[in-house]
């Protein structure tokens, strides 16, 4: 699958226009307070571009997974349809107002906001309430998504998408609105995601290594299958490594293993060999008898895990080997941790991979891409995120791209000629 470049907000005429921007403000909120505003700050360049060029912004986002009302439901006597206190975007309106240094209007019902939209003047900002307060946003029926999209599209003139994290979902705000308006532009965040993934999938600087970890082979089958035709090296870590180890006849103690995936692991290793992809698996391990932290976990001397022990991180010799592989590459894509990095005693492998990628990027011009989710969290925790070429904002979306799938929320945007 090739990823086609899309027209960006720089190609759109926004002066005197009302610009509908699908952002990703799905931020953690505790007791009405935002605990991490990274996603809000990430959307600022796109919003500021519209304001600077003399347009106004209508911001749309989801937050959490509220149940959602139907558009046909009667309006309650008090409040709005579908409202859930835990998922309101009202705290986000206050935070974005602080960050932009200007008042941000808030429409308490995203499907009853025409009066708010009509009052917008150039350089004004309006945030609509959580689009998932309506079930039609993520309905499996296209006609239901389209009905909601038509209402939202009527508020504005231009559609911009900056929500890569939900690009793998067909929804009223991701695919419905650009369909109604006949065009869609990528915001700066979305553009960066598309540009980096298109480079790594279509024309990466070589050699290219894929570092794949996490718990289950079954979660990464399609990714491995798709990437084997594109990469030069494959580095495997995390619990999934032990299904491969067992498939090769190694002793894995009581480490996690998907017994029903042993044949699949063998066939993936065979396919790698046929495609001249060199595969690296752990040669030593950090183990414990139970799945819990230990002051001094056992470090094995060999590739075999002793009976009664489970491997919970890669060992020092494996770390050295993986650092060396990353060091000889020009591009690296990382999806999934090397161990149970949430426990400090099993975080060395994951953090070492992050450091090798960060150092390679800063010193040797490595193109480093972190595929969202746990890997992005690990890169942040290790302090290396700032040193990477690109840390993806979408776990599910980046995984589907690496699996060779088309993302509906990207495909719908207008192609760059």
Curated annotation (Swiss-Prot):
Its EC number is 2.7.2.3. ADP binds at residues 214-215, 220, 238, 311, 335, 341-342, 374-375. CDP binds at residues 214, 219, 238, 336, 341. The keyword Zinc does not apply. Its cofactor is Mg(2+). Pathway: Carbohydrate degradation; glycolysis; pyruvate from D-glyceraldehyde 3-phosphate: step 2/5. Keywords: ATP-binding, Cytoplasm, Glycolysis, Kinase, Magnesium, Metal-binding, Nucleotide-binding, Transferase. It is an enzyme of class 2 (transferase). Its main location: cytoplasm. Mg(2+) binds at residues 215, 219, 374. ATP binds at residues 215, 220, 239, 311, 342, 374-375. Belongs to the phosphoglycerate kinase family. This cytosolic PGK lacks a C-terminal extension of 38 AA which is present in the glycosomal isoenzyme. This is Phosphoglycerate kinase, cytosolic. It comes from Leishmania major.
